[in-house]
Swiss-Prot record:
Domain AB hydrolase-1: 28-254
Function of the protein: Catalyzes the transfer of the acyl moiety from in vitro synthesized 3-hydroxydecanoyl-CoA to acyl carrier protein.
Enzyme Commission code: 2.4.1.-
Gene responsible for this protein: phaG
Protein name in the entry: (R)-3-hydroxydecanoyl-ACP:CoA transacylase
Species annotation: Ectopseudomonas oleovorans
Domain of life: Bacteria
Top-level taxonomy: Bacteria, Pseudomonadati, Pseudomonadota, Gammaproteobacteria, Pseudomonadales
Keyword Transferase: yes
Length: 295
């Protein structure tokens, strides 16, 4: 299962690497938004859960993954800017749904507050409107280690906290990935944490009141950092909010064990299953060999 690769130009400012997993029988397209320090590779299991029921789009932020070589890392990118990048991708791929993981939820809620045309439903996983004590400790220590560019501590911090329930093999992959990131990625994450601690989450929640589509919030019952109880407070901000709990799962949900993977897939498909609607033009890529450049 190989994606159709395109590097898209976003308003002449950023180049964004995208992978489009086409399913010929699918009528709906979903865009996946990853969390901090993550890349398109983090969504391998989620793609298997959603494809071929849906066309699936993955992308890397301009400062991360396969988008990095296409951008000059001259300035930090705010969550608001990430939201506008997402809006451009929604329009380009004519997406019906979006799904975010962890802190990708902040830019997703900011984007949905603009009520993008064509988006029918959203899934927000492992995210919370509350920065509780475990999460605050995680962010505070992360800020300290990122500022010092302490790769050993950053790698261990992720595995010892939000990744504590991952299988050992995934922890090794996690450590190798997180501890080998470029210094500008550490600086970008440091910037994001400060945004969150100062005002960014509050801004996302204020904007969430404008969201007019159904949003499903999924959390694991073993997740101490974005808890089931805290996530339910989204009902105060998102009018058409729905909630699902994945049993015996922590922050990383479908990556943690087979049962959690099956339950997460069942919950997602149950919420997103296509309904009868008017036919719409299906996305066709710009054909320029393996890589496409679209405005």
């Amino acid at each position: 299962m190989r994606p159709e690769i395109a590097v898209l130009d976003i308003q002449g400012q950023y180049r964004v690497y995208t992978g489009f997993y086409r399913a010929d029988a699918a009528e709906n397209t979903i865009i996946l938004i990853n969390g901090s320090l993550a890349t398109t590779a983090s969504f391998a299991q989620t793609v298997r859960n959603l494809h071929p029921q849906f066309n699936v789009v993955l992308f890397d932020q301009p400062y991360a993954g396969k988008s990095k070589p296409h951008n000059r890392q001259e300035r930090f990118i705010s969550k608001e800017t990430e939201a506008h990048i997402l809006l451009e991708l929604i329009e380009h791929f004519q997406a019906d749904h979006v799904m975010s993981f962890s802190w990708g939820g902040a830019s997703t809620l900011l984007a949905l507050a603009h009520q993008p045309r064509g988006v029918k439903k959203a899934v927000v996983s492992s995210f919370s409107p509350v920065i509780n004590e475990p999460m605050r400790d995680y962010l505070d220590r992360g800020c300290q280690y990122l500022a010092a560019c302490d790769r050993y501590q950053v790698g261990n911090l992720v595995n010892d906290t939000i990744g504590k329930h991952l299988p050992s093999l995934f922890k090794r992959f996690n450590y190798r990935h997180v501890s080998s990131l470029d210094s500008h990625e550490y600086a970008q994450m440091h910037f994001h944490i400060n945004e969150v601690l100062q005002h960014d989450l509050e801004r996302a929640l204020d904007g969430a009141r404008n969201i007019d589509i159904p949003v499903l919030f999924i959390n694991g019952d073993r997740d101490e950092y974005t808890t089931v109880e805290d996530a339910r407070q989204f009902s105060k901000h998102v009018g058409r909010s729905h909630f699902s709990v994945i049993r015996d799962a922590g922050h990383f949900l479908d990556m943690e064990n087979k049962t959690a993977c099956e339950d997460t897939r069942s919950v997602m498909l149950g919420f997103l299953k296509p309904t009868m609607r008017e036919p719409r033009h299906r996305y066709q890529p710009v054909k320029q060999g393996q890589h496409a450049l679209a405005i």
